[in-house]
């Protein structure tokens, strides 16, 4: 059968996910957001590919009857750190029905260690069962060792060597009459 992948992300980056999947994959992306979300969701279920949706939209869709999801990607996963929130519960339900799950976040630990432990627990419950009294792990290398199977931290220094050479392009444009007038006035007024 077809591969069934879902990307759940904030609305502000849905288009970026669409563009990157089209650019780097042969999988068909489906924008499951906006007025045609139901139709796109049905089409994705029938054809396979990558459904790209938002946290708000996924809560409205009827996904209870979904077969197994091959891969669930949760971008900005810190949005689901509160286990009592409806958004979090929806994502946790999808997580349980997914063969593979990838939580992406630049801020896994915003306020309390328990928030990160909660996210890790959705991916590897065995790890967090060992860490029930998480206070003892704050700032410790033991905590880092415990979560290592599910946590990859990349700093800018780690990836700088993997990036392509910086390309700078200068493009000079001429102002129109009105734009030139606004510019000169802005320069005069400092």
Regions found by a protein language model. Give the residues of each.
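Conserved nucleotide-binding/hydrolysis micro-motifs of P-loop NTPases
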Residues: 12-14, 37, 57-58, 107-111, ...
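Conserved motor-coupling elements within RecA-like helicase/translocase cores
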Residues: 38-51
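Conserved helicase motor
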Residues: 31-39, 55-60, 81-84
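Walker B catalytic acidic pair
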Residues: 75-76
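Short glycine-/polar-rich loops that comprise or flank the Walker A/P-loop
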Residues: 2-3, 27, 97-100, 114-115, ...
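Conserved helix-turn-beta segment of the N-terminal RecA-like "Helicase ATP-binding" lobe
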Residues: 13-35, 123-127
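Conserved Walker A/P-loop ATP-binding site and its immediately adjacent core
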Residues: 2-23, 110, 114-115
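Inter-lobe coupling linker of SF2 helicases/translocases
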Residues: 52-58, 63-68, 86-87, 92-99, ...
